Regions:
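C-terminal motif of bacterial Sec signal peptides marking the signal peptidase cleavage site
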Residues: 14-16
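N-terminal helix-rich structural modules
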Residues: 23-193, 502, 509-512, 565-568, ...
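Post-HEXXH active-site segment of zinc metalloproteases
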Residues: 213-214, 218, 359, 380-407
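Active-site-proximal, well-structured secondary-structure segments within enzyme catalytic domains
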Residues: 155-160, 195-356, 429-440, 446, ...
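Post-HExxH zinc-binding segment in Zn-dependent metallohydrolases
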Residues: 231-241, 394-432
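Active-site scaffold of zinc-dependent metalloenzymes
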Residues: 173-176, 180, 335-363, 374, ...
Length: 607
């Protein structure tokens, strides 16, 4: 009898448990359905409003007419409308309440709801006047930056003209004039930057962030301290190599400019880049003079060749609208308006309307840049698919976009690739160590600029409320500490040299994306070279390899619908690490140490 009673009790319990399970499943489905309705409506409106805002923003970047504020006014209105939607209380309240039951939701729903709140934090509806003021200030700052008229000795010059002078000019006095001309724009941007700092900080504080830097870092699922520690870790790992490069560059540049006393810090106007972020043009590799080959091409060939590369990997041809709507080439000298000359890729409608803004001329820099920008374009096209909601049509994180674009630019510059295109003679002899040195002067030199000067300046600007009378002092302290460079003459606080870098104004508090992207690109490239192509990572040829194309497309296609760490581990088998980058440049250390024998090392030790 007792046995039967136990069995009966068990059956009752099982029946009750079954009912509970069924009820719970029904309840979970009901909440999931409710969330899905909310998200579907949100995604539709988000896509619509972003399309309008992107079109308005596009005009402010491609047609800057002095004295005509119509594009700016239209852009302000479109951005305010988008901000009012993403930051409205209905969306914030719903996303917040749904996330309280996130254990009942699908992972994709949870990701979207968190994205809703992240986007709301920059535009909270409770602070509408503040958001409108920020949008207006951002539009004006962009117009002031890109509408600026550069002059050398009173003569109008373009940003490209200045870059060419810094690349080719041998006379130090003329170089200094060009460098100083490039910094004049900062004077008029300083007050706007301080205003934007305050507006950006106050805006995100409305949803609980301490400052704008913390807000931007949070997209990685990290705290500010965690991000800073990771950046410093990468910087320290690459420090020994950069120290050798810095010493080598000081002595070689002093020799080039016939300066007897080698300075401890490299004068900025000695370098071929306005911010000292890329020194690669200091080295010419015999047998790989791409510029001379490209002189016979026109600007359109450069971009079309980039498309042919992606198509060879199995990607589709670019949409017809890309060619119709993009702004790819420099304006004629007699143009009645200006444009932003900084290369960028645009995802206009979060679907197939993709565009690029460039000023392509047939040289090696624009050749590499075009391959890079098309990397963004194909990333957009890959994740614009029914499996990825509009909210998550982004890179796995912001660094992924830059990593894949930069990787394709690097792949297009490798010797076997260029030989395949007859851009350099087949089986041409070149100095492999000089090639590696040239690459290091790009990729390695960039790390202290991005992780140090830029990221630490913006950290101090937003997280420490850097005072207006210390902006230039702090900028050059960081440039000395991390890059080992100095201005050609004293730069007082009437200047704002940081603001001459476009990202400080219009892509704020996220320049570390580029640093992380370089680490990531070498990790992914190393995997492709060794596991798919079975080639030396220094001498690869991606061209025409469909397996490489599929591997890259598989990373691109999920967009932000999968965790970035999961994507990396799944595709490469390891977590984010600078090891592949260190391995790639390891042959260079012995060479540089030999070159630097008897030379004085002056780069500051990193603490």
């Amino acid at each position: 009898m007792k046995k039967n009673l136990i069995l009966l009790t068990g059956l009752v319990a099982l029946f009750a448990c079954g009912n509970d399970t069924s009820n719970n499943a029904n309840a979970d489905k009901a909440i999931q359905d409710s969330v899905q309705t909310f998200l579907s409506n949100y995604n539709t409106k988000y896509q619509e409003k972003n399309t309008i805002a992107n079109e308005a923003s596009w005009l402010t970047q491609t047609k800057i007419v002095e004295g005509d504020s119509s594009n700016a006014i239209a852009n302000n209105k479109a951005q305010e409308d988008l901000a009012a939607f993403t930051g409205n209380s209905f969306n914030i309240d719903n996303a917040t309440n749904y996330l309280k039951q996130q254990e009942k939701l699908t992972p994709l729903q949870v990701k979207q709801l968190k994205s809703v709140l992240y986007k709301a934090a920059n535009n909270p509806g409770t602070l509408q006047d503040l958001v409108k003021a920020r949008i207006k200030a951002e539009t004006k700052q962009t117009e002031d930056l890109f509408g600026f008229e550069f002059k050398i000795d009173g003569k109008k010059v373009s940003a490209n003209d200045i870059d060419e002078k810094l690349a080719d000019e041998k006379n130090l006095e003329k170089r200094q004039k060009a460098w100083e001309a490039s910094k004049e724009v900062g004077k008029g941007l300083k007050n706007g930057l301080m205003n934007l700092r305050d507006l950006r900080n106050k805006t995100v504080q409305g949803l609980g962030y301490n400052n704008y830097f913390e807000y931007q870092v949070s997209e990685y699922g990290m705290t500010t301290d965690e991000m800073v520690q990771m950046l410093q870790k990468f910087n320290k790992e690459l420090y020994p190599l950069f120290r050798e490069l810095h010493t080598y560059a000081r002595y070689e540049l002093a020799k080039k400019y016939k300066v007897k006393e080698v300075p401890e810090l490299i004068p900025s106007h000695w370098l071929p880049n306005r911010w000292g972020q890329d020194w690669s043009s200091l080295v010419d590799v015999e047998g790989i003079n791409l510029d001379s080959a490209l002189k016979t091409k026109d600007a359109e060939w450069i971009v079309k060749q980039g498309e042919r590369f992606y198509v060879s990997l199995g990607f589709p041809e670019l949409p017809k609208t890309f060619w119709e709507k993009s702004d790819l080439y420099p304006l004629p000298k007699d143009a009645k308006y200006k444009k932003n000359n900084h290369a960028s890729a645009w995802h206009m409608d979060y679907d197939k309307d993709v565009r690029s803004l460039m000023s392509v001329t047939p040289n090696s820099e624009w050749y590499e840049t075009s391959h890079h920008e098309l990397g963004h374009i194909y990333y957009y096209l890959c994740y614009s698919n029914p499996e990825v909601p509009a909210l998550l049509r982004e890179g796995a994180n912001r660094a992924y976009h830059e990593a894949l674009g930069s990787m394709m630019g690097m792949a297009a510059m490798q010797k076997p690739f260029m030989e395949n295109l007859d851009l350099i003679p087949k089986n041409s002899k070149s100095d492999e160590m000089q090639t590696l040195l040239k690459e290091a002067l790009n990729y390695v030199v960039f790390i202290p600029f991005s992780t140090g000067t830029m990221s630490m300046f913006e950290h101090d600007l937003y997280a420490k409320n850097l005072p207006a009378d210390q902006l230039n002092k702090r900028w050059w302290e960081l440039a000395a500490q991390y890059q080992g460079i100095a201005p050609p003459a004293n730069r007082g606080e009437e200047y704002c040299d940081a603001a001459t870098k476009t990202h400080i104004n219009d892509d704020p508090a996220q320049y570390y994306d580029y640093a992380l992207s370089f680490v990531l690109l070498f990790q992914v490239h190393d995997h492709i070279a060794k596991n798919i192509l079975h080639q030396d990572p220094h001498n690869t040829n991606y061209y025409g390899n469909k397996e490489v194309g599929k591997f890259i497309a598989d990373i691109m296609t999920p967009g932000a619908s999968k965790d970035w760490r999961e994507v990396l581990k799944e595709k490469t088998g390891s977590d984010l690490s600078a090891k592949a980058m260190l391995d790639y440049f390891s042959p260079l250390m012995d060479y540089l140490k030999k070159q630097n024998e008897g030379r004085k090392y002056t780069l500051s030790e990193l603490k």
